[in-house]
């Protein structure tokens, strides 16, 4: 899993308007784009959260979900596995192709592998 620049990951607290608050759970091999806000929700495995997307409290993204840039997932919404979602509020746009699912598996591991390159470059200077 990789979290890009400016992303905010947050839980919600227990209080007057939320009996228990909502934890944040992020699965394996997830790419969280720049400036995305992930708030008290569950993100499954092999998801891509687009740049500037917002996911609100108690929302659930099943495995293999691609969320478009700037999309808004409202509280308590469940996004079904294997689809692209876009818009505000996020709506199911179309099924993901096998090539796109393969890209989701590749994306997070690629970004994570870049850290090794940067660490090596930094140690040589």
Question: Where does each model-flagged region fall?
Answer:
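Glycine-rich hexapeptide-repeat left-handed beta-helix
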Residues: 5-24, 34-125
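Short proline/glycine- and basic residue-enriched helix-capping loop/turn segments at helix->loop/beta transitions
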Residues: 31
């Amino acid at each position: 899993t990789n979290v890009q620049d400016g992303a905010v990951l947050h839980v919600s607290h227990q209080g007057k308007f939320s009996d228990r608050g909502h934890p944040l759970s992020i699965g394996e091999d997830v790419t969280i784009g720049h400036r995305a806000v992930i708030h008290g929700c569950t993100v499954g495995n092999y998801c891509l959260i687009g740049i500037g997307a917002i996911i609100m409290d108690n929302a659930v993204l099943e495995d293999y979900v691609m969320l478009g840039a700037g999309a808004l997932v409202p509280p308590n919404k469940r996004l079904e596995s294997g689809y692209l979602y876009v818009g505000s509020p996020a709506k199911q746009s179309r099924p993901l192709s096998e090539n796109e699912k393969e890209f989701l598996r590749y994306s997070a591991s690629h970004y994570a592998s870049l850290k090794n390159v940067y660490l090596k470059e930094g140690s040589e200077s």
